[in-house]
Amino acid sequence: INKKGIVVDRASGFKEDLLMVEFKGPDVNAGEGKLRTDKKRIRYAASEGNVESVYKALVLGTRDYVKKCGFKKAVIGLSGGIDSAVTAVIAVKALGRGKVLGVTMPSSFSSKGSIEDSVVLAEKLGIDCQVIPIKSIYNAYTKTLSGIFAGLPFDVTEENLQARIRGKILMAISNKHGYLVLTTGNKSELAVGYCTLYGDMCGGLAVISDIPKTMVYDIAEYINRRKEIIPVDTIEKP
């Protein structure tokens, strides 16, 4: 930045870089000796937009956290929604497609479209996607609890059971294979409590937990700027 507050040179962000800047003018004091500069102009890194910067920060943060914690691979629950889709893309960008496992866990309440969107996303990212139905586990839970739940209506309790079953499956995979579970909740959901304790909050790193839902959509559009990676149905899903 020059004395007028104008950016005159910029190094690349979120990766190692070397920037050489030439100083000119009577106000430059080189101290003892001569300040030698190469007149050849070194490249000028383009200014990044806010969405691009946030995306790159999330990729770098995920890569560093996974590596420094001693993990080599990560596992993500794919719901067919935009949060898990964006998280999966960030994970693949950070770790590589061979180091990310996607798991979709449909129940009797899951739509066919959600399952298909999860599988399509995994195919486009080139990652393995395991489909593990949870209907029988869910039925076993509700049968076990039928006595103490007798006479009470179906409510958020049963909905949370599904999330907690999925969380247990992901943690079991983590324990058995040594993968880090990446959770997919965004800041808007966490701010209002739209999440399930011991369910979709289970994991070692909440990748997008510091960005609001609006930014999640912006990042999805940025990811799809050249070609469709995240299915359009996922982005347009209410």
Question: Across the structure, where does each feature detected by a protein language model lie?
Answer:
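A glycine-rich phosphate-binding loop feature that marks nucleotide/adenosyl-phosphate handling sites
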Residues: F71-S84, I137-Y138, N186-S188, D233-P238
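Phosphate/ATP-binding catalytic cores across multiple sugar-kinase/actin-like superfamilies
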Residues: N50-V75, I169-I173
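ATP-dependent adenylation/pyrophosphate-handling site
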Residues: K72-L78, I82-V119
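C-terminal, non-catalytic macromolecule-binding modules
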Residues: M20-P26, V216-P238
